[in-house]
């Protein structure tokens, strides 16, 4: 308990938060039981820290080998979790694996026996096939945003990774949607479901609570001009524009660029270095507009 308290104090300090929220506290408490966990929570609720604290509390310096595996649906989420881990888990060897990243660099890092691996299903499965990732010592498995992993078509890769894992002691599955049934390969043991979808206290808020939603109907041929008028009239700060196709992202960006508006494109057809460069510009406010596909 003393080690867990120290972990919590360090996490709060390094992440600049005063204390854990209700969901994070309940996750820590529930994780002490032998049951697997299904965590249902909305975006922006502190879910990442909620599952990372129990994961880190189970890692032992006496064990050589991979003790925890976190599977996520996207490169950006893998990098986001890796960034949090770097702040709260100093001294623990961590490797982040995802498509578009150098396989050679990942292979070198994996050869030094990491305790924790974060990655996307396709890249993790590939490393396992090639013998670069061995999960004989795995204690904890996290399936983060599991619903999105399935929606993106990763069921085969996830089954390939998870089905052979018979000795995992703790599985944590997170999702933004509630489902009565799960694929058999998840093989959860007497799972406890923690449902935080729409159950926040009156004084608890998330980033989405600060958003206002408006709808503007426009003929397809006038959409770009309507968007341009909105940007000129509203003069917004940081702005995310979502499109449903990569080609649409590129078309909208070119339209705005031709009219003197700086904007970054962000989609799965771009090289990883270009994606990271676009995000960096958006984060440091050198570009105030980012145009993205909803699954990028």
Regions found by a protein language model. Give the residues of each.
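Conserved interdomain hinge at the start of the Helicase C-terminal
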Residues: 209-258
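Walker B catalytic acidic pair
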Residues: 121, 137, 145-146, 245, ...
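Conserved pre-motif I regulatory segment
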Residues: 1-40
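Conserved nucleic-acid-binding Ia/Ib motif block in the N-terminal RecA-like helicase ATPase lobe
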Residues: 5-10, 64-129, 137-140, 251-266, ...
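Walker A/P-loop NTP-binding motif
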Residues: 25-37, 48-63, 79, 84-88
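P-loop (Walker A) phosphate-binding loop of NTP-binding proteins
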Residues: 40-43, 73, 244
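Pre-Walker A (Motif I) flank of P-loop NTPase domains
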Residues: 33-39, 64-68, 114-115, 169-170, ...
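Post-DEXD/H (motif II) to motif III coupling segment of the RecA-like Helicase ATP-binding lobe
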Residues: 134-204
């Amino acid at each position: 308990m003393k080690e867990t308290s120290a972990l919590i104090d360090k996490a709060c300090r390094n992440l600049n938060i005063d204390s854990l929220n209700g969901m994070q506290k309940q996750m820590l408490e529930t994780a002490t039981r032998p049951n697997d966990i299904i965590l249902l929570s909305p975006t922006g609720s502190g879910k990442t820290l909620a599952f990372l604290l129990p994961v880190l509390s189970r890692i032992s310096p006496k064990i050589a080998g991979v003790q925890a595996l976190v599977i996520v649906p996207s490169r950006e989420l893998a990098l986001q979790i890796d960034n949090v881990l770097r702040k709260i888990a100093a001294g623990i060897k961590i490797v982040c694996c995802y498509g578009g990243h150098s396989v050679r660099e990942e292979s070198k890092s994996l050869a030094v026996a990491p305790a924790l691996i974060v990655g996307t299903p396709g890249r993790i499965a590939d490393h396992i096939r090639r013998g670069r990732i061995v999960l004989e010592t795995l204690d904890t498995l996290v399936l983060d945003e599991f619903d999105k992993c399935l929606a993106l078509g990763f069921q085969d890769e996830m089954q390939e990774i998870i089905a052979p894992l018979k000795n995992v002691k703790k599985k944590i599955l997170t999702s933004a949607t509630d489902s009565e049934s799960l694929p058999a390969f998840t093989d959860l043991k007497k799972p406890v479901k923690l449902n935080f979808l729409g159950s926040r206290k009156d004084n608890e808020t998330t980033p989405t609570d600060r958003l206002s939603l408006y709808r503007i109907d426009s003929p397809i041929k006038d959409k770009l001009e309507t968007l341009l008028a909105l940007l000129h009239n509203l003069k917004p700060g940081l702005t995310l524009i979502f499109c449903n196709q990569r080609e649409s992202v590129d078309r909208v960006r070119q339209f705005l660029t031709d009219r003197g508006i700086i904007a970054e494109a962000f989609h799965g057809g771009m090289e990883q270095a270009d994606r990271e460069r676009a995000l960096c510009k958006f984060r440091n406010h050198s570009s105030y507009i980012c145009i993205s596909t909803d699954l990028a």
